[in-house]
Amino acid sequence: MTQDEMKKAAGWAALKYVEKGSIVGVGTGSTVNHFIDALGTMSEEIKGAVSSSVASTEKLEALGIKIFDCNEVASLDIYVDGADEINADREMIKGGGAALTREKIVAAIADKFICIVDGTKAVDVLGTFPLPVEVIPMARSYVARQLVKLGGDPCYREGVITDNGNVILDVYGMKITNPKQLEDQINGIPGVVTVGLFAHRGADVVITGTPEGAKIEE
């Protein structure tokens, strides 16, 4: 089974959590694209979706799924999204696709966060995957200096502007032994919009695509 087939297995397995008549929170990325394909088979049965990115919105609309603005809904039953890394405590690094801020907002209003990944994303300690930080452009250099003080090696993601009009710093060399503390520290730097650490709001359900199929941990 290829990596993409494992992603597909995870994405389609998440469909069991979708309730008829509900509005579904939808993330961003290659694994989520498989979930969106699956959700398309229920387009007549759900009310619609709240999307975390322009890319996912376009894909959902192409399948006839109505898009709701985040401000139109008080809460969501579920939010389905992938991760770049996930540890045993279900804390994650996300934001490789630069949609971290909107992903964090949609995750915050969801009752249940369902993380869909392939087996390569599970790690003992977060930080091998570079940690994305969304930054207001004028604060880029200042934030980078503060990230160095925290032990990181920040790298400006050239040519990338987020859906919110900001830039991304990818922080290398972080061995993240206390994700919640680091999330607070980085979010406290003036000019940071948010960091791609999902520690305070981790996953409630993890669906992992494996060569044997989807493995669900609730």
From Swiss-Prot:
Catalyzed reactions per annotation: aldehydo-D-ribose 5-phosphate = D-ribulose 5-phosphate
Residues annotated as binding substrate: T28, G29, S30, T31, D81, G82, A83, D84, K94, G95, G96, G97, K121
Single Gene Ontology MF annotation: ribose-5-phosphate isomerase activity
Enzyme's top EC category: isomerase
Protein family: Belongs to the ribose 5-phosphate isomerase family.
Subunit relationships: Homodimer.
Protein name: Ribose-5-phosphate isomerase A
Organism for this UniProt entry: Vibrio vulnificus (strain CMCP6)
